[in-house]
Amino acid sequence: MTGFLSLRYITITVGLLVGIGTALFFNAGTLFAQITPPFYSIEYRPYKGPWMQLKTSHFRIIYPKGLDSVAYKSGRILEQQYPLAQSLTGGNLKNFPLVITNYSDLSNGFVQSWNFKSEINLAPIKGKALNPRGGDWLEAVLSHEILHATHGNIKGHFLLNSFGLLFGPDLTRSLNFYPPAGIHEGIAVYHEGKNSLSVNHGGRGNYGYFKAKYWANLLSDSPWSIGDGLIPTEYHYPLNRHYIAGYFFTEWLQETYGEGVLKESLLRHYNRFPLGLGVALKGVTASWPNAMAPVYRKWALDNYAIAHRARNKTQIDDVDYINPLNKELDQRRPLWISPTKLLYVERKPHQERGIYLYDTETQLRRLITSDFFVEDYLYAVDLKSKEIIYAAYKRGATSFNEVYSYLYRESFLEGASKKALIPGSKRMFAPSVDSHRNSLWALKNYLNIAQIYEYRNNNWLQCSQFKNTRPIAIAIHPSMKNTYAFLMQKRGFQGVWFVNNINSCSEIMSSLGGAADIGFDNASIIDIQWHPIKSTLLMSVDDRDGVRVVEYDLYNGQAFVKLDAEFAAYEASYSEDGKLFSFVDEQNQKNIIAVVDSSRIAANSFEWPTMNAIEIEKSSNSVLLGNDLLNSSTNWKIDSYTDDRSWWSPRVILPQIIDQSSFGSEDFSELEVGLFMQSTDILQERGYRFLGTLYRNNLWYQMSYSTKKFRPGIDFTFYRRPNYFIFSPEEGASVDLISDERGWSLGTPLSYRFPSLTRFSSISITPLLYVEGLRYIDGSGSFLSDYVVQTKYGLSSFLQLRVQQLTRDIQPRSGFITFISSQKTFKASQGSFTLNNNRYTYRLNDKYAIYADQKMYLPVWKKKNISILANAVILKQSKNLLFSTNNIRSTGFYSPVFPNSSYIGRFSTETIVPIWYADQGFFTVPSSLKAVYLKVFTHRMYDLANKTNIGYPTRTSFGAELNILFNISNITLSAGFGWYYDVLEKKSDFFIGSF
């Protein structure tokens, strides 16, 4: 499902590895620094008021002050749904945290296994992603997420559960998240239609818009296999296919093998998790997935035939499609601006989403604007000013979780001025132009619903005071004055309310407060659009098994089905003169806009009776989920949320085994062993990491505490870590020693994120202070000297400027990334040590280092997602080196590159050529193949400290690597093999790995 995420997985990605490498570089004891990635990110939350908590029998609901009614409603929904969810998954919950936030308009809900909790944004999902008959936002999202929560806490054999005592609770619990994501989402979507609203055909399993995408693929030449449908896709449409196929596979399993099949299989998987869910299903059903596949496909085909056999499908000839040759396409919302020209929204895998102008006569199109549009894609056309008005999301400056919608104006004339923000439009969406009142109407997020506003005379006025009704869209007749249609959801019903003769926007509540004027039995109206001339309203109506285009005549009260396509047709509109008719046609892996002569549509229409007033009233008053707990919930108590001390105990404990042979000295080749521990509080505003190890008869440690309970936050670290170095007591002699570095560091991260979500820009600056004592140790671990204290200060800065990475990009296709770090000691220090009865004096000279890394991404062939990275790096240090020169060196050289130089530069290029976007899943073996790509690279190193008559000394290497992205369970991995050539050494070699 596009709109809210339901799971967070810990994934091993290239980005994560880069992050670890960065952490290693900036610890002086590079080889001994933490090698375990942080499992819990520390987050700054924009809400800084008091947090409250409501405790129920099984849940702990944490929310901003003032949202008590939302918390109680959430608690009742969760408690009512808990036994239903438990019966499907078998998992148990106790004191499970749910965090509710209201500082984002981007709808989201998820359950995470690491720091086990659920979190939802109050902003309801926009657009068509959820079945309107499933109730309001809280009912939909909570009844979905509770399935993930119970699934995530399945307990199996005692032996496996006891690992929680050894390795922390989160590592053990994460075993439940190893099955394919489509199983997680499939069973949750299945439950949406099995909760107490199922009698009203709620949930996406009873939603034709959702099911049409599956059926379009099922009847195509390339249907998804079981494995394909259960893995998330990053490269092919629809991007939510694991929700869709996961639901159908779950429904088939439950129908074929009984309601307990997944519950038993999930428990069996937990106890045998390395074998995967396919083997677990075999143990329960006695059938391997390859034997299930033909039976499952036949069931799906029969399911489609039964659902569609009574439908009167529209047969239309001479249909023109926009970009019909594209295999994968997402086109939405055609709106006409003349008899032959229309605007529409489009996205392809190699391009961002934009609003385009299309001429039906010339078949030429032109991009008007691109942005991160609100997902209902509702925009308005102002024909007087020749402008479009649309809603787009922008990021907050302080937190990734802070996202708000705004309204913008932009001319659709060629060469016109750029877009302009409409004042006061924060959190608004779904605009509609009222040419009769010279005003603009829009909706504004309000908790889990929305309110109606009008912008007139440069002022916004609130026009509604809804509590249990959510407006979806506003349609204003372009030629008939005082004729308004409001598409709204009221409980499990979604229909149309008409309003006439408005003098003040506040008058609309007298018409909108009652029952709807139009509705259809066991169906939902999901979008509306007026005829430009006539008194008829076009509507897309979802009737559980498909989406039809229906036209309603305002004067005679009759509704006619104008179009019933093979799978789904929606978002229809007439041209300015009414002669042409456009709609979105659902096809395999694409939504494509069709244009046809309107007379051909009229010839195939047939009447569809609307509901009467009594039926509408009854459908609009379904009981809220959890309403049967109204009385008992009065015993639940609200108090202030305060951190309990449970987060002090580690949430994850992992053994550490570090091979120190990388020191390069046989005398010091030995395993360093120890433990890594980490934890965080529920809100993830603060946390700690601890790494303790034993090496050379000494205890080494690194204890870090981070907090972002205030801005900008602090990072504080105590450490004792070793660093290897070579001491030369006399000419031609050398001794290997270890420097024992003990101290603390303090950093204050200052960051700012720019608002664009289509091209990411941010800046981060972190001042650092180190106070460190240094002494020397011999190979046996004996101390040779006392500590000498040295103080260092540093500055780390990170800039990302207009970085863009689209659906099929392996690396960013454009943008700049700059990383600069510097360190400098305050003053020189002096010490001494004794070795072989000789006393040596050493001086820690005043040292400094500046590391600068500039990356520039450039598109080579946008349509094929081919891009190049140009990377320039310098490392300038004092003569007494502060950092190892290996930090700037790239793999591909046979021997050390300028190891003693104080000023080194490197220029590299990496060209990424995607070869195959596989997106293939394997169900019996818990794995999937994501993509295969070629990387061609060049590296040139410069010794900038030693210029000669012919220039700077250089070293060059080049090569290529074939890389494979794949998943084992839900862990993303990268493997490759390649070849490189060292020009100076005149040697080449093959390698296995990835760099």
Task: For the regions a language model picked out, list residue spans one by one.
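Residues that define the transmembrane beta-barrel architecture of outer-membrane proteins
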Residues: 669-673, 696-701, 738-746, 785-795, ...
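Outer-membrane beta-barrel translocator/channel fold
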Residues: 570, 588-590, 714-766, 772-785, ...
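C-terminal outer-membrane beta-barrel translocator/porin domains of Gram-negative envelope proteins
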Residues: 718, 723, 729-731, 782-929, ...
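Outer-membrane beta-barrel initiation region
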Residues: 602-716, 797-813
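Beta/coil-rich, acidic/histidine-enriched accessory regions frequently appended to metallopeptidases
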Residues: 38, 42-43, 51-53, 265-386, ...
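Acidic/His/Gly-enriched intrinsically disordered linker/tail segments
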Residues: 43, 115-117, 133-141, 149, ...
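Juxtacatalytic substrate-recognition/specificity segment
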Residues: 33-174, 180, 197
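A flexible loop/linker signature enriched in serine peptidases of the S9 family
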Residues: 201, 205, 327, 346-355, ...
